[in-house]
Swiss-Prot record:
Keywords: DNA-binding, Metal-binding, Nucleus, Transcription, Transcription regulation, Zinc. This is Transcription factor pbcR. Residues 1-40, 109-131 are annotated as: Disordered. The lineage of its organism: Eukaryota, Fungi, Dikarya, Ascomycota, Pezizomycotina. SUPFAM superfamilies: Zn2/Cys6 DNA-binding domain. Residues 47-76 bind DNA.
Amino acid sequence: MYPWSSTGTSPFSHPDNEGAESGDMSMGEEQQQPHQRRQKFNNLRACQSCRASKVRCDQPNPGMPCLRCQKSGKPCVDAASQPGKRQRQPINSILEMESRIETILSSAELQDSAGDGETAHSTALRSPSQLSHHIQPFQHLPMGFAIPFNGGNSGTEDLNSSIRSWLNDNITDLDARTTETIFSHYLTNMVPTFPVVVFATGTTAADVRRNNPILFLAILDVASSGFCALETQRKLRKLIVQAYVHCMLRTEQYTLGLLQALIVSATWYRTIEPVEPGEQMDIYQISHTAANMALIMRLGESLNAKSWGGPMFPRREMKKGPGSAFQADSLEARRVWLGCHYICSNTSMSLRAPNIMRWTRLMDECLEVLENSPAALLSDRLLCQHIRLQHITEEFAMHLSAEEASAPAKSRAIQIQVTHRAFKRQLSEWRRTVGDGWDAHCTATSDDVPEDNAQRLTPPPPIVAIEPHAITEFMDTIDNIFRVFTSLDMSTIRALPAMYLIRIIYTFIILVKLYFAAAKLPAQDAVLQVDGLQVSRRFNRVIQMTAGWGPLWPATKLTTVFTKMRSWFESGGDNNCQRLQQAAAWLTGWELKPPSQGRDAHAMNMAEVVSDDGSIVASSSRGPASWVPSLASTDVDTLAFSHEPPLGTEFSIAPPPFRSMSCATKSCSPQAGAAEFMHDEEVPLEGQRLGDLPNIDQMDDVGMDWSQYTNMGFDLYNLDAPFLPNPPSGFDPDAAMKDNCADRNT
């Protein structure tokens, strides 16, 4: 029997309360009932005030306040009524979150009851943050031309179906025959200039429209000029811009088809004049967006998983090598990866900013697979030549930038020349790898540009001195560029990538600057040099080429620009002195060194000349400086390619990005001059059938503002014109070159 059973009390009774009231309980009595004392302290709980102060709660009478609360006058909360501490377990919050997710998923499935089982399954795998983003209704895009995206699901299928339905409802004049014609024009005339987004033999416009509508929309946007009404082209442009905004900002559904569409829009970008709200498209933003999407998609990691490890792993190379069937399913992704690198590299060099897609071993593996895989297309080898040439250009620019930052001033010029010659050898090796069947004229040189705006604004403008032997190289290169460009018909020019047109315009700016440099010579020498340039004849020839094509892109733009340039050139009549006085400073910043000074120049062709204010302009100075190009070893070579329609590619080593050789300023920066020239509204337009042409207030010849890239480094020998077809039998390029030189000397 328990001890408390003899007294008839329960274990929860307090027999010592009466002794506690009298206060005369002795120690012996407490020791006689140890179990009741322990029970008392185990069952009684302190009030809230005593628990907060962590002191003993002395409550003589049950139901009455404790002694401490009575003395302080505080309310004594009954200890028995105080709830116990709730033990929160982590599993409870997780279960609560899962129940909420299940509720959201069930509501989403009810809203999207029309969707198939596969779509519902993919929706169930989304994270809560993504799900809360997707189930919200889309806001209207600020384009003034809304795409009818369905419901709340922003998946790829929903976007594709929305684009397809929009095309069917709003572009009624684009029937199946017209779209097939535009698609055939893209495949036949535009793809050969840069075959990065290609299709298998037998692919039709209906197939692309059904499987990849956003890519089909991008192709219609860049290739529809001349095949449909202008209003239809504007609808296509607004839709593709709105689709890009939606994919970039309002969804995370990134696919290879979206990357292909961005590459197409960036490569063959064009403007529709006049630009209306909702039609603005930034070519630089598109290029970097494509590269960022490729990185976010981890496209490079997916391709790295197919790596064969190089020659150190022969067994793995036999199984997963570039010529194995294992690589056949990755060809399209490799083209997209190389295409993103290409357009991003061109953009970064134009903006003089770092390229976010640096060259890695993966790029080399992509080139090997595209060149050796049995499943590769014929155009893939041509694409690889484009990529390799751009890589040589970018590496050359990076090496010059590193030498500018690290080399001492005295040895900088020598190191630059050594680097220049080394990369010219790489360019020669690239030439030898090109296939047979095409002619390409390749030249290379270096150039120097200012580093920052403060240097460009430093007066007075420097003098760029040109060695006597270099003027021959200048003229030979311009002759070849002019011959290549004028040999093309306008249908071929219209299919060229946008950047080629900018560089052709820059070549003619160089021609005008050489004219004013030759006009500074003594009378007899000036006549010989000016006659050899044939500036008026060349301008008349290109204007005649482009003026007859009316408003088609890029005929109107090229005609307007070349006419303005001719107006600058002919503004002073036949008097050279008057022309020099009326011409802008950026056109007259060059001078030709007399032969006597040319003999004293050192071997690296870097010279010091005196500017107009008498200050010495040195190649190694950080202030105003002169640049004497080294072109002694630059030759114009003729080599062959083998593919069918005309092809355009890059053949020159451009100036380095994000660097300054501190050897030029605004006066010798063609881009700065071009911007000034294109903003001059006082120069009248000349030429026949040009009265209805719109005035251009900015250098927007390919839909890009020249102010965005005033430092764009296009060198004088940048022959970015398409390849020529096979020459007629018996054609001797060396003899033709000699005849051209003989005509100039006579």
